[in-house]
From Swiss-Prot:
Entry-linked SUPFAM superfamilies: MOP-like, P-loop containing nucleoside triphosphate hydrolases
Stated name of the protein: Sulfate/thiosulfate import ATP-binding protein CysA
PROSITE patterns per UniProt: ABC_TRANSPORTER_1, ABC_TRANSPORTER_2, CYSA
Job description of the protein: Part of the ABC transporter complex CysAWTP involved in sulfate/thiosulfate import. Responsible for energy coupling to the transport system.
Matching InterPro entries: AAA+_ATPase, ABC_SmlMolc_Importer, ABC_transporter-like_ATP-bd, ABC_transporter-like_CS, Mo/tungstate-bd_C_term_dom, P-loop_NTPase, Sulph_transpt1
All residue ranges annotated as the ABC transporter domain in the record: 3-237
Protein origin, superkingdom: Bacteria
Catalytic activity: sulfate(out) + ATP + H2O = sulfate(in) + ADP + phosphate + H(+); thiosulfate(out) + ATP + H2O = thiosulfate(in) + ADP + phosphate + H(+)
Record flagged with keyword Nucleotide-binding: yes
Enzyme class, first EC level, given as a word: translocase
Primary residence: membrane
Amino acid sequence: MSIEIANIKKSFGRTQVLNDISLDIPSGQMVALLGPSGSGKTTLLRIIAGLEHQTSGHIRFHGTDVSRLHARDRKVGFVFQHYALFRHMTVFDNITFGLTVLPRRERPNAAAIKAKVTKLLEMVQLAHLADRYPAQLSGGQKQRVALARALAVEPQILLLDEPFGALDAQVRKELRRWLRQLHEELKFTSVFVTHDQEEATEVADRVVVMSQGNIEQADAPNQVWREPATRFVLEFMGEVNRLQGTIRGGQFHVGAHRWPLGYTPAYQGPVDLFLRPWEVDISRRTSLDSPLPVQVLEASPKGHYTQLVVQPLGWYNEPLTVVMHGDDAPQHGERLFVGLQHARLYNGDERIETRDEELALAQSA
């Protein structure tokens, strides 16, 4: 079941929380709405579900406008962060509930309901807990029950509002893998809200990064990491070094160091430089690619690579986080050399293109 979000705006009083949002979600895709608090991601999810109504715009499921349909008529499954299980019902009865309250013409008979719930319990790996009550379950088990209950009525679309937010880190990781496997098996269309970058990129087919009621980028997880569309996406995804410098003529100056950009940008003046740890050139010997001396402050082996915190020597004040590959991990206090050639430069929110990027843009024009 595909979802079309067309020009959705939403305001609460004088506060605009969604600004002309448009997004197409193909059938069978799992999409993460990722952003900080106040970005509008949960409001958008609730509008898709019919739990909130947009100020303007349309929601279409497989081409049919459902904008005015009540939530119960949209055939959407919704999983909340805090489970919302019935405390006085067993696991089996919690999952059964949605089926028993269907209109008579849609309601399966008792035998069919029992068979379906039994199958769902096996699918969510809780068949041995069918007779227990919510108070007797762990957080991860409760969330599996909530998901099985949502799937019992065979929703056209599954929506999840920070489904793992109340769980500890290890349980979250296990449930993320399990949800992804379940999605691969059932191929349902799903949209989930999260503020966790790792969760979004690990589980989703596509990540929609939101900020202040706008979509900053909607792309495959790897693309969001490697080719952030805006400065906000670059910074929000985390693991990024930021240095302050200046463009003068055709050169970029940072501290006592400078290097040629290969052309003279129209903009001249202060800029911010961004580099993810694995984008920093690093070597034990000075070279054209790695001319800047640094000293190792911390070294954290991660298996096939080592994550380092290094202090620039004489050319910048703040430490950098870098990644060095290989088994021969540097020691605390060791001198290394880094290069910043792969940096992204920004004047405020405006990207300053490098020479290679300028050529690529010219060739594609």
